[in-house]
Design a protein with these regions (language model features):
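Short hydrophobic beta-strand element within catalytic cores of glycosyltransferases
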Residues: 323-326
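Aromatic "clamp/platform" in nucleotide-sugar-dependent glycosyltransferases that forms part
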Residues: 306
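Carbohydrate-associated surface elements
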Residues: 170, 192
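Conserved acidic donor-binding segment of nucleotide-sugar-dependent glycosyltransferases
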Residues: 338, 342-349, 358-363
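Active-site proximal beta-strand in glycosyltransferases
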Residues: 101-103, 114-136, 143-144, 165, ...
Length: 407
């Protein structure tokens, strides 16, 4: 019996060190794909030695897949003059990747797929409507400069999707209101974390590994670690976080920044100007296993974003037993309970510093098991399994109907 084919479209290479929740989610969908499915990924090449424009047999997280790199993208953590999404979409034209199921994690590439047959699903990871209205750096996203053009494109493309999944309840509701004729296709979907990678340690193990990290960084054994992980882009507002560290009047606290991006140089400059070089370590992009280790031993994870969906990194922190401090953005404030984190009502260095201080001084109020409990419903094996089960059921019904018609 033929297997149903799922083709995933996104502008990255899963074997390259890359930063971002979308990439992590796609990797998880591939890892936990049931054997009943054939999985394909249309992505990018990581260097000039890789063959471009041909299907290649590959393996990811123990799963055999077919991989099609559209073009070479050597560093997707830093944006170029021409947005990567534009390059990726342009490279899609003239090709046909028709499949039983097609998952798009950006809207724009689906322009090339308008006439393709098969069931298409759009995953919405951020609230684009909030992004286009956000104040601040105009380089945050291209569409902020041309919101009318984006919404015109959205109106053109949205009807082709059989399903529209959003990890942001407000965004899902807005899509239902904007497109009432397809409101039954729009649904909220839980983001998910891989609990085989992100899990808590015992208190003794945690303290021992924390001391080891402090020793490696030539810091006091009493150091309390604050972890930030994500792209250094305007959306994440790392400058706000650095200023919050300057406002945090707590000895033996140290910020770990795991990530890279276009604001890396600006962040380094801010650190130097505020005299924080001894209180902040920039780690750059790190492998997921190393990130998981940092989640397990940090005292608190911090999210300073201007806008979000439900960032995977928050689920990963909670699943590792680490409390979260966040600005009021996206789904994270709805996820956190009083014993798993703190939501800052104001996006200011002082407010963020006060929230960090609250968790650092009173860890007993944010026990590890409370954090793990908050993340538990989002475990990947359960969330991803349910999505695939629904897909397979629809595929079987469609094929049974086709066979019945033939007979």
């Amino acid at each position: 019996m033929r297997k149903p084919v799922l083709t995933i479209f996104y502008q990255f290479n899963p074997w390259q060190s890359t930063i971002g929740g979308i990439q992590t989610l796609i990797n998880t969908f591939i890892k936990y794909a049931p054997s009943e499915f054939e999985v394909r990924l249309v992505g990018t090449g990581c260097d000039r030695t890789q063959t471009i424009g041909k299907w290649q047999a590959a393996e990811l997280a123990g799963r055999e897949i077919s991989f099609f790199p559209l073009f070479t993208l050597e560093n997707d953590n830093v944006r170029s003059l021409i947005p990567t999404t534009v390059k990726y979409t342009a490279a899609m034209f003239g090709r046909c990747f028709t499949s039983d199921f097609m998952h798009f994690h950006r809207l724009e590439p689906s322009l090339a797929a308008l006439n393709w047959q098969g069931e298409k699903t759009l995953f919405i990871h951020n609230d684009i409507h909030t992004q286009t209205k956000a104040a601040g750096d105009k380089n945050a996203i291209l569409w902020r400069r041309f919101p009318a053009a984006y919404f015109a494109l959205e109106s053109l493309l949205v009807n082709q999707f059989s399903q529209i999944f959003s990890c942001n309840t407000d965004s899902a509701q807005l899509y239902r209101q904007r497109y009432p004729h397809i409101e039954d296709r729009v649904a909220y979907i839980k983001n998910s974390f891989d609990n085989e990678i992100f899990y808590p340690l015992s208190q003794e193990q945690r303290q021992a590994q924390r001391r080891e990290l402090a020793k490696m960084l030539n810091l006091s054994e009493e150091t309390r670690f604050i972890l930030f992980a994500g792209r250094l882009h305007p959306q994440k507002d790392p400058i706000l976080l650095v200023r919050a560290i300057a406002a945090l009047n707590e000895p033996h606290t140290h910020l770990l920044i795991a990530g890279d991006g276009e604001l890396a140089a600006a962040v380094r400059t801010e650190i130097a100007q505020l005299g924080l070089s001894s209180r902040v370590t920039m780690l750059g992009a790190i492998p997921i296993q190393e990130l998981a280790r940092l989640h397990r031993i940090s005292n608190v994870f911090v999210l300073s974003s201007a806008y979000e969906g439900l960032p995977l990194v928050v689920l990963e922190a909670l699943a590792s037993g680490t409390a979260v401090v966040t600005t009021r953005c996206g789904e994270t404030p709805k996820l956190l309970a009083a014993d798993s984190g703190v939501v800052c009502e104001q996006r200011s260095p002082e407010s963020l510093a006060a929230a960090l201080q609250q968790v650092i001084l009173h860890p007993e109020n944010y026990p590890s098991m409370s954090c793990v409990r908050a993340a538990h419903p989002y475990a990947a094996r359960t969330v991803v399994r349910d999505v695939y089960n629904d897909m397979f059921t629809r595929w079987e019904k469609q094929n049974f109907s086709a066979v019945s018609c033939i007979n």
